[in-house]
Amino acid sequence: MCGIAGGNLFTTDTIKESLDDTKHRGYDAQLVYEDDDMVLGHNRLSIQDLSENANQPFTDSTGRYTIVYNGELWKSMLRYRNELEKKYDFITKNSDTELLLYMFVEYKEKCFEMLDGMFSFAIYDREEQKIWMGRDWVGRLPFYYFHRKGKLAFSSERKGLTKSLDVRNKHIKVVLPSHYYCFHIEDKRLEKVKYYSVPNRIVEEPKDEIVKNIREKIELAVDNELISDVPVCTILSGGIDSVIITYLLSKKVKNLEAFVVSNGIDEKKKDDLYYARKASEFMKIPLNEVIIDDEYVMSNLEDTIYAVEDHKWVQVSPAVAQLPMSKAIHEKGYKVVFGGEGSDEIFGSYGHIFAWKWKDDDYHQARIDLIEKLHEKNLVRTNKAMMYGGTVELRTPFLDKTL
């Protein structure tokens, strides 16, 4: 997980200011690339290939393509590296940044639908004078841009544009999930293409077969996302989603640690902490408890609003708890944490969904809407909170495309 910025609206000075405004997204390296009017910048949180060779902005061996990238590619993508290493001059041991860049060099825009991971990135084509921007299918990571009068600027967060460039928030647009964009620098044109749609179909299978398939897919998703050169941990809130992820991780990660945030134990209410303790005891996993009170919430509201770039209580209330949890995770030496986000949307767990029968078109469309709107609320808020609180990357296996 990292922070990116760039475009032909930035200057060397303003992009450094933008990177400083989003430095909480990565403290391991901060570098800038310049070519005529094009400037690209990157704050790195090193997770795969910790060497300096994997720092960004990253340029291919010919000097034509340069990438700034925020995200991770999963294990399933390694097969492409084995193929591409035979054709291109890789300089890193296992950098997914280099793999992603050569995926684009080889397959161009076709690569977007081939990618398996969470990502937001931009690639500058020096020869054709184009900037390509892309975001993963569900929008796990935030990505914004400003385009006006032949100028383009992009950043991982709104504050990376509003402060350094003095751009008004209402003029900033979202790079949409499942889309890629191509900015033609010379004729000042911005194209937008949708490369993926959530399947709109209902498959009828016996209940036992459905349960078996879901279990297998979740297990594969967790294993697929277990790619890291740094230790990983897990969020254990006590809910069924985080319990499932934690249980599967415990079978693969030695000395796994879990984290929970709560306002204290209440035996009558049996809140998150109660069930998190029960689950950790059953799985024999150490549980780090982060306890906050009303005073903490009130004194940290301003910081939370700044972190998530939203003042709505539905966004601020969970984020105000995620910030201290992220800080606690960071203080224990972790950069990567797994969580159960996305399960309610994937499985249609919200109460209003049950207003329809499962075969009704309205029911099916409501579930698709939940998934397609995830990036507007939960995903963006959680990512920003976890990065601001402790510079921690959140992985969410329930949002594996196969599920």
Protein language model annotation of sequence segments:
Residues Y65, C111, V222, T304-V336, ...:
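Conserved glycine-rich, hydrophobic/aromatic-active-site segments
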Residues P231-C233, K335-F338:
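Residue-level preference for the first positions of well-ordered beta-strands
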Residues M1-E309:
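Cysteine-centered catalytic environments shared across enzyme families
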